[in-house]
Amino acid sequence: MITAIHNPAIYNGIKVFTAGGRDADEIQTKDIEDYISDIKPEEVKEVTYDEGKASGYIEEIYPLNEYLDNIIASVDMQAIRNAGLKVAVDPMYGVSETSIKTILLTARCEVSTIHERHDTLFGGKLPAPSASTLHALQNFVVEKGYDIGIATDGDADRIGVIDDKGN
């Protein structure tokens, strides 16, 4: 995955996950770095996208539906439906807008979003859901009468939650 995690876009880089979906640890990361540093530029082969697909180097995958199904299966969706929640979402210009909105709409929540436009520069702001970055969501929740506000960082692995009073 290419991400700056919850940092400004200038920190974008490659994030490596293990087969189990966890972050690569220091030893695994060092092994990867050592392997890459041993590659000589003249050894790097170039292929077109079509050649890469045909040769099996590139595999197109579409994991979103399976990801959403797993989340929906692990959450008490009926309890959320019964609550009749009005939810404000702030994906902070990152990648969570489609997934979080789909989950909440499946739970029959009323959903509105701010900062939903995908922007690799995160609107020039720090894409981290923390007290210093949630003012817009806090104001939106209180002014529009939402029950809850949910913010995610740029790559959607951190969350911030605002109650109906803006806390």
Residue ranges and their predicted role:
Residues N12-K144:
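Gly/Ser/Thr-enriched, mixed-charge loops and adjacent short helices
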Residues M1-Y11, F140-D164:
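Glycine-rich phosphate-binding loop
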